Amino acid sequence: MKSSMAILLVMALIIFTLDKNYSTAKDLPSCEKGIHRKVTCKQCNKRSDNDDDYTKCCNSFDAFLMCGFLLSKES
């Protein structure tokens, strides 16, 4: 039983490492290609009433993360 748990743990670690290496923030679609990002940026823009926030959210992954974090705190 312990050996099968160890094997599963090693497999999970390998899968996590491969996933992390092959999917980066740059791979995420911009607002033109990604519906989730577009919706999140629009909601953030409605909260701030500043069109510049929408543009920043669409073009910068860090701004997108901050916007999503702020929206999650409101819920």
UniProtKB/Swiss-Prot annotation:
Keywords: Disulfide bond, Ion channel impairing toxin, Neurotoxin, Potassium channel impairing toxin, Secreted, Signal, Toxin, Voltage-gated potassium channel impairing toxin. It is found in: Secreted. GO terms for molecular function: potassium channel regulator activity; toxin activity. One of its GO terms (cellular component) is extracellular region. Gene3D superfamilies: 1.10.60.50. Its main location: secreted. Transmembrane segments: none annotated. It comes from the Eukaryota. Expressed by the venom gland. Residues 1-23 form the signal peptide. Contains 3 disulfide bonds. Belongs to the scoloptoxin-03 family. Inhibits voltage-gated potassium channels. This is Kappa-scoloptoxin(03)-Ssm1e. It comes from Scolopendra mutilans (Chinese red-headed centipede).
